[in-house]
Regions:
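C-terminal segment of N-terminal export signals and the immediately downstream linker at the start
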Residues: 27-63
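Conserved short loop/turn motifs at secondary-structure junctions
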Residues: 48-51, 69, 150-155, 279-285, ...
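Mobile "lid/hinge" segments at catalytic clefts and subdomain interfaces of large enzymes
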Residues: 202-326
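Long, structured ligand/cofactor-binding scaffold of large enzymes
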Residues: 58, 63, 67-236
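Short, well-ordered alpha-helical packing segments
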Residues: 12-19, 166, 196, 263, ...
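N-terminal secretory signal peptides
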Residues: 1-10
Length: 348
């Protein structure tokens, strides 16, 4: 009993000393601790250094674009022009006629679109890929019975392909996502997509990332190889189709109904050689994943890609997926991740 009392007295004394020490901690020390915690939180964010550099350079690049063109810009123009491979080439490109050369921030592929492109990359003699890229094994999984049985069949039937993709990923620097980890577009949205960036993936529904305010374009294997090697990626300067969303969804209406309605207006070819840029107060009524659904299906009207302006829904999604630091950086340049006010006031 006495031993317990002594221990308790020592504990109380130590606690009091600790309280005094805590009360004398300076504000800078608390700030340093907070910053250290924030730094620790970023350790799980993929390619964080690249993202940090992107947002540090974005305002300067955009300022140079504004100085050269001297006019209000659409969001599409902002994202294209800050990604010019040769910034000095900037001019008033003719939409639908001139070609521009771009430098994407990241790339991706899957187990069907990837193998031939990677084999071509291997002939280049490059030691590593030139930009962050992910490889997702999802297309060779056939949904028939259930996850366990279907994955067993996929692993058995595609063992050589999966082994090859895993090995080259380790050797050349791809992030490899094995079968069963998800559909590539969702994997990208949850782990890689961030507002303002540009991404190339060998899949027609890559524009899903437009729901995150990203310029994401589906490409062929040869285009992917150009990006992996750090070469210029050429694109015909797209036309821009502005779609103003007003009001809010009601009743049984979902985000998918928005793109279905738009598809009926544009037809299956109406978006060819064009980027669909959404704007208006109605955008804020849609979730980030709802926006992603709309952009995903923009491929059905032939659009090069689709994109939404940065808003709070993207902040919430980034926060929910452990990327609050990315959300904070995007918020710092929020006005430049949307079309200029003059454009929204007079889109024509």
């Amino acid at each position: 009993m006495s031993e317990l009392q002594i221990s308790r007295r020592k504990l109380l004394k130590a606690s009091a000393a600790g309280a005094v020490a805590a009360s004398t901690v300076s504000a800078p020390s608390l700030l340093m601790a907070k910053e250290a915690k924030a730094a620790q939180d970023t350790s799980k964010i993929r390619d964080f250094d690249m993202i940090k550099a992107f947002y540090a350079n974005y305002p300067k690049k955009l300022a140079a674009v504004r100085a050269k063109l001297g006019r209000p810009l659409t969001l599409t123009e902002k994202l294209l022009f800050v990604h010019l491979y040769h910034p000095e080439s900037l001019t008033e490109f003719k939409r639908g006629q001139d070609y521009i050369e771009l430098r994407p921030d990241r790339a991706g592929t899957h187990d069907i679109g990837g193998p031939m492109a990677i084999l071509q990359f291997l002939t280049s003699g490059k030691e590593r890929i030139a930009l962050p890229a992910a490889l997702v094994a999802d297309h060779l999984v056939t949904a028939q019975t259930g996850v366990r049985k279907d994955l067993q069949i996929a692993d058995r039937d595609n063992v050589e392909t999966y082994s090859f993709l895993r090995d080259v990923s380790r050797r050349y620097g791809f992030d490899f996502w094995p079968a069963g980890t998800g559909i590539c577009h969702q994997v990208f949205l949850e782990n890689y997509d961030f507002p303002g960036a540009m991404m190339l993936v060998t899949d027609s529904h890559t524009p899903t990332a437009g729901g995150m305010g990203m310029l994401a374009i589906g490409v062929g294997g040869a285009d992917l190889v150009d990006a992996l090697m750090g070469m210029e990626w050429e694109l015909k300067m797209p036309k821009i189709i502005g779609v103003k969303l007003t009001g809010k969804l009601s009743g049984w209406v979902s985000a998918k109904d928005v793109i279905l309605k738009l598809s009926g207006i544009l037809s299956t070819k109406g978006g060819t050689n064009s980027i669909i840029e959404f704007f208006g107060d109605g955008c804020q009524q849609l979730s980030c994943t709802g926006k992603g659904t709309i952009c995903n299906m923009g491929a059905e009207v032939g659009a090069t890609t689709s994109v939404f302006p940065f808003d709070d829904s993207m902040v919430r999604y980034l926060n929910a997926t452990g990327r609050a630091a990315v959300a904070d950086m995007a918020k710092a340049v929020a006005a430049d991740l949307r079309a200029d006010k003059e454009v929204m006031a007079d889109p024509a």
